[in-house]
């Protein structure tokens, strides 16, 4: 390496770093020096500059390799057979290969890490500051039924604006934001848009009924979240929603009294229906054949009904609050009930009112979906102790908790979004980490034997088995 070097460093008082031959005086700057005469400070600065230059070269090389690999993946998606596989991943089909889903989740998380390293900080802030636009634009296209107008196939903006009765310029602006973020697909050559796996689920007749979330998130949840700053202040016990509405009532009671609970109940019911298939296929419920499974806090009954349909020899029961009981009786035990086909295996005497903070109906097996995240640790422990006291010991005895497990990374973002959602709406609302779930189990007479992420669903199946009952349980 040429040992005549000119250094661009304010402390060293040389204007630039260049390789220079002995005796040269490039650009009229100070003469080159011989490295043998450099001070320790000068040598460290020279070394640092070469390291920076070397690091930039390595980063550039790595990024170019990554770019090549990503382009290859994008090209792969265009092959007919591969396109179907990628579409299945996008739909979160419960029958997808778990190994493929696991690899996809790792790639998504890594891609997100790389994005955070490369993306300018102001763009990261912009996503948060202007995030309301995504919600409101999505709500607008749902209200205008744009996904339904595209049900028969792609349309140009001119065609779509005519069929939907919208302004073409503003329709283009809104859809541009959405299709660049994975909702709808755009073809530049024909200047047309079509439904993709995400926008397809927003159609009014789609079985998941995801469209119901658009209105609730853009209005009710958006309003409730405005109470966050005050609710985060030290000493405040109200939830953000209670702060915003200035009430001590629970959100369910408040919305019921104000006539807006129906919309929220429909929204929650849609979420349950959309995720039930993954909850059924993702855990070995068949191990409970010929036994009775009680759904504690069974809500709309969709989970136990789905399990009874999937396992013909399973018996079922539901315990929920007196307020919910009329809805459950209508769902199972009226001539036109939507779950009438399984009513004989969940008779009226096993659809009961109760309070699991007080006591629980005896059974060999229990399932709880989206219940414990509404309670603080003390209350959750009380519920788990009550179930432990009531469980009938047998080879199949267990409690399956269907709740989110907090996780970092892009793939795990639903657990964090859910964490904020229950915190906003419930006074003690919180999701928990795997460590927290294991601690709750250990101090209430349970052992977590497995935690399984369910396909196409937000929660995991946390399998708890009764252990030797400690004195304090």
Swiss-Prot record:
Protein name (database record): O-methyltransferase aclU
GO molecular function terms attached to this record: O-methyltransferase activity; protein dimerization activity
UniProt-listed InterPro entries: COMT-like, O_MeTrfase_dom, Plant_O-MeTrfase_dimerisation, SAM-dependent_MTases_sf, WH-like_DNA-bd_sf, WH_DNA-bd_sf
One Pfam assignment: Methyltransf_2
UniProt keyword list: Methyltransferase, S-adenosyl-L-methionine, Transferase
Annotated active site: 373
Organism, scientific name: Aspergillus oryzae (strain ATCC 42149 / RIB 40) (Yellow koji mold)
EC supergroup of this enzyme: transferase
UniProt EC number: 2.1.1.-
Membership in a protein family: Belongs to the class I-like SAM-binding methyltransferase superfamily. Cation-independent O-methyltransferase family. COMT subfamily.
GO biological process terms, semicolon-separated: methylation; secondary metabolite biosynthetic process
Function: O-methyltransferase; part of the gene cluster that mediates the biosynthesis of aspirochlorine (or antibiotic A30641), an unusual halogenated spiro compound with distinctive antifungal properties due to selective inhibition of protein biosynthesis, and which is also active against bacteria, viruses, and murine tumor cells. The non-ribosomal peptide synthetase (NRPS) aclP is responsible the formation of the diketopiperazine (DKP) core from the condensation of 2 phenylalanine residues.
Pathway(s) served: Mycotoxin biosynthesis
Positions of transmembrane segments: none
PROSITE patterns xrefs: SAM_OMT_II
């Amino acid at each position: 390496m040429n040992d005549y070097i000119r250094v661009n460093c304010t402390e060293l008082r040389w204007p630039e770093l260049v390789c220079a031959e002995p005796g040269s005086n490039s650009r009229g700057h100070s003469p080159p020096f011989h490295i043998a005469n450099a001070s320790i400070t000068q040598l460290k600065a020279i070394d640092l500059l070469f390291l920076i230059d070397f690091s930039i070269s390595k980063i550039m090389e790595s990024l170019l390799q990554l770019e090549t690999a990503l382009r290859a993946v994008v090209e792969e998606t265009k092959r007919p057979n591969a396109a179907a596989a990628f579409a299945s991943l996008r739909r979160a089909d419960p029958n997808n290969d778990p190994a493929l889903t696991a690899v996809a989740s790792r790639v998504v998380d890594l891609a997100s890490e790389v994005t955070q390293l490369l993306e300018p900080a102001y763009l990261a802030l912009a996503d948060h500051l202007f995030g309301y636009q995504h919600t409101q634009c999505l709500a607008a296209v749902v209200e205008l039924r744009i996904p339904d107008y595209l049900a028969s196939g792609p349309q140009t903006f001119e065609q779509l604006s005519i069929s939907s009765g919208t302004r073409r310029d503003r329709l283009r602006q809104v859809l541009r934001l959405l299709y660049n973020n994975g909702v709808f697909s755009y073809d530049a050559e024909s200047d047309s848009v079509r439904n993709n796996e995400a926008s397809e689920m927003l159609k009014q007749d789609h079985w998941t009924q995801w469209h119901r979330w658009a209105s609730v998130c853009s209005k009710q949840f958006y309003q409730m979240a405005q109470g966050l700053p005050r609710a985060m202040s030290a000493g405040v016990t109200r939830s953000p929603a209670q702060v915003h509405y200035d009430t001590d009532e629970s959100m369910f009671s408040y919305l019921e009294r104000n006539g807006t609970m129906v919309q929220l109940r429909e929204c929650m019911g849609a979420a349950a229906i959309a995720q039930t298939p993954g909850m059924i296929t993702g855990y070995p419920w068949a191990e409970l054949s010929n036994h009775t499974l009680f759904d504690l806090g069974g809500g709309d009954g969709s989970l136990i009904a789905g399990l009874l349909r999937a396992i013909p020899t399973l018996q079922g029961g539901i315990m929920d609050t007196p307020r919910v009981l009329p809805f459950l009786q209508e769902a199972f035990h009226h001539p036109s009930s939507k779950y009438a086909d399984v009513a004989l295996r969940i008779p009226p005497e096993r659809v009961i009112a109760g309070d699991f903070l007080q006591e629980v109906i005896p059974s060999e097996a229990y399932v709880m979906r989206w219940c414990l995240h509404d309670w603080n640790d003390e209350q959750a422990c009380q519920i788990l102790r009550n179930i432990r006291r009531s469980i009938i010991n047998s080879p199949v005895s267990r409690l399956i908790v269907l709740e989110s497990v907090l996780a970092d990374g892009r793939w795990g973002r639903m657990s964090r979004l859910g964490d904020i959602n229950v915190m906003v709406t419930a006074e003690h609302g919180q999701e928990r980490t795997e460590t927290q779930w294991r601690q709750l189990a250990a101090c209430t007479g349970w052992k977590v034997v497995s935690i399984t992420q369910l396909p196409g669903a937000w929660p995991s199946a946390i399998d708890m088995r009764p252990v030797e009952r400690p004195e304090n349980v």
